Design a protein with these regions (language model features):
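Conserved short "hinge" loops at termini or chain/domain junctions
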Residues: 1-98, 140-157
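Short loop/turn elements at secondary-structure junctions
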Residues: 24, 101-157
Length: 157
């Protein structure tokens, strides 16, 4: 069974320098957060800053999960649950810093089978580049989401 989180942002999409590539990356169904970040920026410092900004938003999203998440039943026989969540701008942006930055994603899908995801070669490479505690925030949101799923669904392994 597959679980997906679908994020719908208020703002159209990203920062001017990478908006075209980002739009192209996210026009394809199923692009993951990490694949998208690799696609939209080859510059390591910019990529790390974008990653950090996304994780700030994810942290805020965790705090507001109950208010913003809506569960929908599987449709057309697909064994999946989609959580549609409004992804707000980070506190940093709301305080007037980084005004030129727009919300990074129009939509993105994250695979919740994170133990397997994190064990993949690409994820190991990313873990060496990005702060381990920040990556743990992604695990945290998966745990919070899983706790809201009906008890009849299987555990994440």
């Amino acid at each position: 069974m597959e679980y997906k989180i679908e994020y719908t942002t208020i703002e159209p999409i990203v920062e001017e320098e990478v908006s075209r590539e980002a739009a192209q990356a996210y026009s394809e169904d199923g692009a993951s957060m990490y694949d998208g970040i690799r696609m939209i920026s080859r510059d390591e410092s910019k990529k790390k800053r974008i990653m950090s900004d996304v994780l700030v938003s994810v942290r805020i999203l965790c705090n507001r999960l109950i208010d913003h998440a809506t569960l929908s039943d599987p449709t057309d026989g697909e064994e999946a649950i989609t959580l549609t969540i409004t992804l707000e701008m980070s506190e940093r942006r709301r305080q007037g810093k980084g005004e030129s930055l727009k919300t990074l994603f129009r939509s993105l899908t994250v695979n919740l089978f994170l133990n397997k995801f994190f064990a993949s070669k690409n994820q190991v490479d990313l873990a060496s580049k990005y702060d381990a505690a920040a990556l743990a925030d992604v695990q945290t949101i998966a745990k919070l989401l899983y706790e809201k799923l009906p008890p009849t669904y299987p555990t994440i392994v």
